[in-house]
């Protein structure tokens, strides 16, 4: 029973403003041009979610013992057809380089998601030799955003980008992305605007007795009134109970929501580490 519970939990372990300042432009095998800094910033973080806790045969169809799990988070959506374990390298604190045994974007692979890749393999040990860097070393491509997303993207080859923003095993989850969504992407049954948020690792309710549908009351959205942030509590939450790291927050206000926060000690990751207070700006594409 414990193995089944752990497998259920691990499944969930799972804007494009151009800079006005003159910078070197990079034509990185993509449609359009981005600066080197903009391409680098596409890789937001990696989250050392579980250490030697995941069965390799079940998740990777290989007999390799118990594996580490590390969600890697991107600002732009990824092209699943370009995804491969050989796209990634993980550097540990002793200088060893690890290639994942397998990778997956499931279950966060619905339209409007596709921003988190779960790496499975051996990436070091939490206390004595933690992972310190994640590198994209193969041809991993982003995709254009689709109708209903407030952010924009283009097709970019991410090969060569890295991050040292590795959240340690003992730390709790935090928000890494938010955007406004509408049309077919919107799963809210009520309200006037919907904000999609994404966590850097999988989450479940931390407070005893809470279900995922109760989490809306701990989120706060903010509108901007002449530089003053006005708080708004969502009236409900959608895109839940699907074992991924995305939520949709349903607001009744017509004032544009520009920031989202989450109260501390309300959700936890699969390692049972609770969140601290977290906030994120709502991303949008400026023409």
Residue ranges and their predicted role:
Residues 2-10:
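Sec-dependent signal peptide recognition
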Residues 4, 19-20:
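Residue-level detector of intrinsically disordered/flexible regions characterized by low predicted structural confidence
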Residues 12-15:
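C-terminal motif of bacterial Sec signal peptides marking the signal peptidase cleavage site
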Residues 20-287:
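Non-catalytic beta-sheet/beta-sandwich ligand-binding modules that flank or precede catalytic cores
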């Amino acid at each position: 029973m414990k193995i089944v519970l752990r497998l259920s939990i691990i499944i969930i372990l799972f804007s494009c403003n151009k800079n006005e300042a003159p910078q070197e432009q990079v034509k990185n095998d993509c449609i359009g041009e981005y600066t080197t800094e903009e391409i680098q910033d596409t890789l937001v973080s990696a989250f050392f979610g579980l250490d030697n806790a995941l069965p390799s045969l079940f998740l990777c169809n290989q007999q390799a013992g118990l594996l580490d799990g590390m969600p890697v988070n991107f600002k732009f959506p990824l092209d699943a057809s370009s995804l491969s374990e050989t796209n990634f390298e993980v550097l540990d604190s002793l200088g060893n380089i690890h290639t994942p045994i397998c990778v997956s974007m499931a279950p966060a692979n619905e339209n409007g998601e596709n921003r988190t890749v779960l790496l499975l393999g051996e990436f070091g040990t939490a206390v004595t030799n933690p992972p310190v860097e994640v590198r994209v070393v193969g041809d991993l491509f982003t995709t254009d955003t689709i109708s209903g997303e407030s952010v924009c993207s283009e097709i970019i080859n991410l090969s060569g980008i890295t991050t040292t923003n590795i959240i340690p095993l003992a730390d709790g989850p935090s928000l890494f992305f938010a955007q406004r969504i509408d049309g077919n992407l919107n799963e809210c049954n009520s309200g006037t605007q919907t904000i999609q948020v994404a966590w850097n690792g999988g989450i479940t309710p931390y407070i005893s007795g809470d279900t995922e549908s109760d989490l809306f009351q701990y989120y706060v959205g903010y509108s901007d009134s002449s530089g003053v942030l006005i708080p708004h509590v969502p009236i409900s939450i959608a895109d839940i109970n699907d074992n991924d790291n995305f939520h949709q927050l349903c607001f009744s206000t017509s004032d544009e929501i520009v920031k989202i926060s989450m109260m501390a000690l309300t959700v936890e990751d699969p390692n049972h580490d609770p969140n601290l207070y977290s906030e994120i700006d709502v991303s949008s594409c400026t023409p």
